[in-house]
Amino acid sequence: ILNTKGILRLIESVPSPKAEPFKMWLAEVGRERIDETIDPELTIERALETYLKKGYSREWINQRLQAIQVRKELTDEWDSRGVKQGVEYAILTDEITKAWSGMTTRQYKNLKGLTKENLRDNMSTLELVLNMLAEATTTEISKEKNPQTFVDNRKVAKEGGEVAGNARKDIEERTGKPVITSKNAVDFSNLISDVIDTEYDKNE
């Protein structure tokens, strides 16, 4: 079974003229990636453009881009502690998610009806903010406690998540409604469209 890389290499090797549009697209994507390596700001601009095309609000996009930065700071901290990318990243992320949301990452994705989609891309603004709080707090606790082993890092991840978990419970107590929602990107896009349509009707 071919993976994504294998499929792309197969397309490149096809001599048929029908494959030319795909080859041109691959070349364009490659050029964009090189440009982004030279000027990282292009990555942010491209992400902003992509989210806008998907129908997200600017408020949500600003939070999402900030969440990317918070996540990067956390993974940089993990790297400095010897945490391995892949399985160990996933375990620590799961620890954080479970501590603040009460669910594992998989359970959270199931709630939103997701398979391979990015969970953060399907969070509400408040969910994103709490997830950021959990990750940013984990980073700060790690810097202070200087964990030496993976077990230590796991404890720190749980502590960071619990801070955001307490904030979530406080919000829910004060608002009388759950923070975590089954709504995903499709629902958010539809909501934005409805608001735009309503405003348009008012101005007609």
What name fits each language-model region?
Residues L2-G6, E12-E204:
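Positively charged, phosphate-engaging catalytic surfaces used for nucleic-acid and nucleotide handling
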